[in-house]
Design a protein with these regions (language model features):
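Glycine-aromatic micro-motifs
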Residues: 2-153
């Protein structure tokens, strides 16, 4: 056995996911026991972000949202989104989107993005808003986007 796995056992399948909340941060993912090798700063068109009280996306022609694309396992996604459902009562479901890397060194790619269809309006948690703006800046996403995030406080 190596690393708790049987020799010759295949690695779990990884899928590409666009995170637009604090999960865009490798440090935040690590708090959930999820270790990613690379976070690709990216943009997704025709969506807008809102925080009321948690972060979510809404369809909006001409708008763009920013975040990070990572490779994670289905088990890791379950851990994240089952935790959010248990803690906040929010059911985020996967949607396919096209993520465009900020640095044009790679092609746009289809990725999963998790969005909730229903969220009761509420005041955002100021600490969460600050943490999200910090994550945006850490990925060198546009400062105007960090300011947009901060405007939810």
């Amino acid at each position: 056995m190596m690393d708790g796995k049987h020799k010759g056992e295949p690695e779990p399948r990884r899928v590409r996911v666009f995170f637009y909340g604090t999960f865009m941060s490798a440090e935040v993912l690590a708090r959930y026991g999820i270790h990613v090798e690379n976070v690709t700063p990216a943009r997704v068109h025709n969506f807008d972000i809102y925080i009321r009280p948690r972060v979510n996306l809404i369809s909006k022609t001409g708008a763009s949202v920013y975040g990070g694309v990572v490779s994670v396992t289905h088990e890791e996604l379950d851990r994240i989104y089952q935790g959010l459902e248990k803690q906040f009562g929010l059911k985020y479901l996967p949607e396919a989107v096209l993520a465009e890397p900020i640095e044009r060194t790679a092609e746009s790619e289809p990725v999963l993005c998790f969005i909730t269809a229903q969220m009761e309006p509420g005041a955002p948690d100021p600490e969460y808003v600050r943490e999200l703006a910090t994550c945006v800046r850490a990925l060198n996403l546009p400062e105007s986007y960090a300011l947009q995030i901060e405007s939810f406080n």
